[in-house]
Amino acid sequence: MPTSITYKDILKQYWGYDAFRGIQEDIINSIGEGKDTLGLMPTGGGKSITFQVPALAKEGLCLVITPLIALMKDQVQNLKRRGIKALAIYSGMSRQEIIVTLENCIFGNYKFLYISPERLGTEIFRTKLQKMNISMITVDESHCISQWGYDFRPAYLKIAEIRELLPNVPVLALTATATPEVVRDIQARLNFREENVFRMSFERQNLAYIVRNTENKTGELLHILHKMPGSAIVYARNRRRTKEITELLNNESITADFYHAG
């Protein structure tokens, strides 16, 4: 089994970093030892490193289950730029494109396949899956499997069926959002062989939080952005609203663009 020194060599070779951050190395060592593992890490905590590094140290293909198409495409592009073979299956692909992608995962020596949970139940995927050499399963946004969570997605329940097809393959579940109930539920629904949780602090010491009560949110937003130097991120509750805010800001001579999971 690879040691942490080997993992650090991989980190240095592909990402240029000399050391891991926070609980990254603990998670990597755990999944590298074949243990089912749950990692609780804040956004920006470096979740992708926790499965990409050990997957590169293992023989075979890492199956990455995520609901976010934009994230799939972004991570696949980033991996390819580093010379790492990665593929994704998402909505909008033709049946032939999906078949070719799955065949490449069987015969093409690829290291990562990103797929949405909705695709896990298809007959073609399950047939091809059993011919793949799967090294580990990564479940991103794993709180979506819990009915106690705020963003429950029934398709995530199919992951337990995939585990039955691959009983000896370890699973790494990752999330930035989980109450104690959700933590227990994630492990139960993913059929963890034993409880195994790593937690990273969610405190952001470089951030200050200010709450402003206003009856004119748009006016307040414009007031803040006109006064503030540099760049800013504006979070919106849905895709439509991201586009509306972008249009509003551009009309007010504030250069802006939108980004969402679609």
Regions flagged by a language model, labelled:
Residues 70:
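Conserved catalytic helix of short-chain dehydrogenase/reductases
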Residues 3-14, 18-22, 26-48, 55-58, ...:
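Helicase motor core with emphasis on the C-terminal RecA-like subdomain
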